[in-house]
């Protein structure tokens, strides 16, 4: 009943929730966990790993055959697991279709109708970053969402590239910058269909440009003329005379 109420408040009728388990042994109580999956699950990046359900009766968490499982990745998470708590259902601190909130004042103001209480800290979060989501096949990670734990680490390519900004599409948006033989994919941004998400998208592009000292020589975008990412790319190209 608590999960149903959370779904009602979040307006999330069917989308699966993630589960944070105390450790890999706890994860094995509800899912099949291979050696390769445990290695990724227990690694320092701590993504959400899609694991096959071990038994029925967990449809309130996920209606399909898999559950997204992650292990604690901050000291605070470990403190939440008392003697009588082995697993926690997790969901992002956001309103439907808007970016995750990471400032205390904004969360308290906007999430009071969803959350019954708030666990806050005076150490402010500097950059919004969702959990990474992957599955494991043949010992390798395949991403549905490459974000916390992996960003802003670059990917090496086999040639020298010009300074590029690739703006991505509209749904499940992200962007990418290039410099030398490296490309720097951004974290997951979300669907670009409201001002809040667009503001986060443009702010993260500026943050990456400062972080890696990249001033693009060209901008790459989707051909769809009505995508917000395409409109942004066109505006930047005109502004910078690219």
Roles of regions detected by a PLM:
Residues 1-241:
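Active-site-adjacent structural elements in enzyme catalytic cores
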